[in-house]
Design a protein with these regions (language model features):
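Terminal regions of secretory-pathway proteins
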Residues: 1-205, 209-210, 231-524
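Mobile, glycine-rich extracellular loop/lid and propeptide segments
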Residues: 209-226, 239-240
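Acidic helix/loop microenvironments that form the catalytic cleft of cell-wall polysaccharide enzymes
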Residues: 240, 244, 557, 617
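Primarily a LysM-type cell-wall glycan-binding module
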Residues: 523-547, 571, 579-607, 611-614, ...
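Short alpha-helix capping/helix-loop boundary micro-motifs
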Residues: 558-562, 618-622
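Generic detector of short, aliphatic-rich beta-strand segments that form the cores of beta-sheets
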Residues: 567-576, 627-635
């Protein structure tokens, strides 16, 4: 698929052309390609449709509204001052972007010319529901990694090599310990700028800046590390997807949202977003407002590696990070990323003194001399024109108006959470110009939802995390998307992370980077190859020190072991941590005539507890009224 620059909306015609390009490239390429089913587009719709019934819940439809929103967006520019940083390591900004690219690729909301038209008005609700489409699966399934045209090398994913500069001193020195395989696989040179050295990934946007590009490489390496331990392609992709889902819920969300809201949705279920609804629709309020929090987290410059940093090196500005991965003409004769641009992850994740942090979640967007997210580029490297086209905050505000997003106050009132007053909105901004732009548009009382989410984060948490509206929007949808994923860990309540981690019982982004071998010294997963005469009990005794822990091995490998009494020489089994992280699971073998309520009565003392058994076994039971003799079920502890 041709590359996409940040903030650009893809058209249906481009998608049709891209599908043909992928087919043509696949036919002439010697590489195998990761197989994923074709993605059918689905609609966007409102998470809170009742708010569309009253115009008072929306921004006023007025002739000067686009101009007022442009002025508000322009007022959000702020110099990149480290004193304004959050406690969130900068890597999570780009994990958030990676997640976004995994779940949404929007078409139909309008080209820039439509958006910037001074006479632009909101689209009718029916047109929004019909025309605005999502081209991703809408699940946390890594289709941005595994989807076509991502090439495979057997069971492994193909990784590209960097271009060696041969330098021994900064700024052209390769970071120590970094190998050649640190770039995305790429198309060859082409006279067509949309394909010239474009990345072969499931989503071309994962090549729009160097940090997300290098994060994508880390996911490819993590997959290959699993295959290197003997797992098949399917097994490795399942393990990686499930640990990725754990990172999204228990690491990423716990950092950027209110943990109590996250925990409530995980344990009590979704209250507003129904991930099982058919037909499935992606919430507009999430995609075009709530989840655009990452734009305020972006820095204008980073500590990137020994060559490009804020401590005596050349600053790794956002301009350079976009240029040196988009390959838009400034790389002369290089076919791939120069090796002096390989990331050193310890600069953007961890607790060290030189770690770059995300900016605070507030109403300010990083800008240095009117650059960064106020200086978006075309594929040729030129600044978008007119000036408002280059300003990402302006685009966000105009698109929210065009798509009839409700105001932040209307959403807060519906959710039953504290509604920010006019004075609280004004107090959350950090410049007289921004306050003036708010008042000029009457936005302090009817605030654009995206702006409100950022102001609320500043008001309630001083920019360290989202407030109640933002937390609800983001956590409801991301947790719901985990629930609707094929390999969902939330449909397997007994599931726990089992890849090596710094803290037992959890798995964070840094653990994935270590496991991929791109941060510090990674550890391989614990695996065991079955030998003739082995049993799960014997394996548990020899590998875990306790034969009674065999159910842990069984549950970890239930996708490949149908019967725990039948394992075969050559099977590669994943092993849990040597130290137990919880009680040993209880199992039950279904007998003829059993029902879930009967099992609940016999084993739990209460027939009404059958839904608990069903919830624990959603990966093997699709209908609670149909269980099969010989099935092995997990019981609640």
């Amino acid at each position: 698929m041709p590359r996409l620059m940040h903030g650009r909306i893809v058209t249906e015609e481009e998608l049709k052309r891209a599908a043909g390009d992928v087919a043509e490239f696949s036919a002439r390429s010697p590489a195998r390609f990761a197989f994923t089913p074709p993605v059918d587009s689905h609609s966007f719709d409102y998470l809170f449709p009742s708010l569309q019934d009253d115009e008072a819940n929306l921004l006023p439809e007025a002739a000067n509204m686009p101009d007022l929103l442009k002025k508000l967006g322009a007022s959000m520019a702020q110099a990149d001052v480290p004193a304004g940083d959050s406690a969130i390591p900068a890597a999570y900004t780009y994990l958030g972007q990676f997640i976004d690219h995994d779940i949404t690729l929007e078409t139909g909301s309008g080209a820039l010319t439509d958006l910037l038209d001074p006479g632009m008005t909101p689209l009718p609700v029916a047109e929004i529901r019909h025309v605005v489409r999502n081209l991703r699966t809408g699940a946390l399934d890594l289709d941005s990694v595994y989807g076509p045209p991502a090439p495979r090398d057997g069971a492994k994913m193909l990784i590209g090599n960097v271009s060696s500069l041969g330098g021994t001193q900064p700024p052209i020195k390769r970071p120590p310990g970094k190998s050649d395989d640190n770039d995305l696989p790429r198309e060859p040179r082409s006279a067509d700028i949309e394909h010239d050295r474009a990345a072969l990934t499931g989503d071309p946007r994962n090549d729009e800046n160097l940090i997300i590009s290098q994060l994508h490489v880390a996911f490819l390496k993590a997959h290959n590390a699993l295959v290197g331990q003997g797992l098949s392609f399917g097994e490795a992709s399942r393990v990686l997807r499930q640990h990725y889902q754990h990172i999204v819920v228990h690491d990423f969300l716990k950092r950027i949202a209110e943990p109590a809201i996250v925990d409530d949705i995980v344990t009590s279920g979704n209250h507003w977003f129904d991930p099982a609804a058919y037909p499935f629709r992606m919430p507009l309020e999430f995609s075009f407002a709530g989840y655009r929090l990452g734009h305020t987290m972006v820095r204008a410059a980073y500590n990137f590696n020994l060559n490009f940093n804020l401590h005596g090196g050349i600053p790794a500005t956002l301009e350079l990070l976009f240029t040196f991965t988009a390959l838009s003409g400034d790389l002369n004769d290089f076919d791939t990323i120069p090796d002096n641009w390989i990331i050193e992850w310890e600069n953007v994740i961890g607790t060290g003194p030189n770690v770059s942090h995300a900016r605070k979640l507030d109403t300010n967007i990083a800008s240095v001399n009117d650059k960064a997210l106020y200086n978006l580029h075309t594929l040729t490297g030129a600044t978008e024109a007119p000036v408002d086209a280059a300003r990402l905050p302006v685009r966000n505000l105009l698109r929210g108006y065009r798509l009839r997003l409700p105001t932040g106050q209307a959403v807060a009132h519906l959710l039953g959470v504290p509604v920010l007053s006019k004075d609280e909105i004004l107090a959350a901004v950090n410049s007289p110009a921004q306050a003036a732009a708010l008042q000029a548009g009457g936005f302090e009382s009817r605030t654009p939802l995206w702006f409100y989410v950022l102001a609320e984060a500043n008001h309630f948490h001083q920019g360290e995390r989202l407030g109640p509206v933002g937390s609800t929007l983001v956590a409801e949808v991301l947790i719901g998307l985990v629930r609707r994923s094929e390999d969902s860990i939330l449909r397997l309540p007994a599931w726990k992370p089992y890849l090596p981690s710094a803290k037992a019982g959890t798995f964070e982004l840094a653990d994935l980077l270590r496991f991929a071998g791109v941060l510090g010294s990674g550890q391989p997963p614990r695996t065991y190859t079955v030998k003739k005469g082995d049993t799960l009990t014997a394996i548990a005794r020899s590998q875990l020190g306790d034969g009674n822990r065999w159910p842990e091995i069984y549950l970890m490998n239930r996708g490949t072991i149908r019967n725990p009494n039948q394992i075969f020489p050559g099977q590669v089994l994943l092993l849990p941590p040597a130290q137990p992280t919880g009680p040993i699971p209880k199992l039950y073998t279904v007998k003829k005539g059993d029902t879930l309520s009967g099992i609940a009565k016999a084993k739990l003392g209460n027939a009404n507890r059958w839904p608990e058994i069903f919830a624990l076994n959603r990966d093997v039971i699709t209908n609670p009224d149909r269980i099969i003799t010989g099935q092995i079920l997990v019981l609640p502890n």
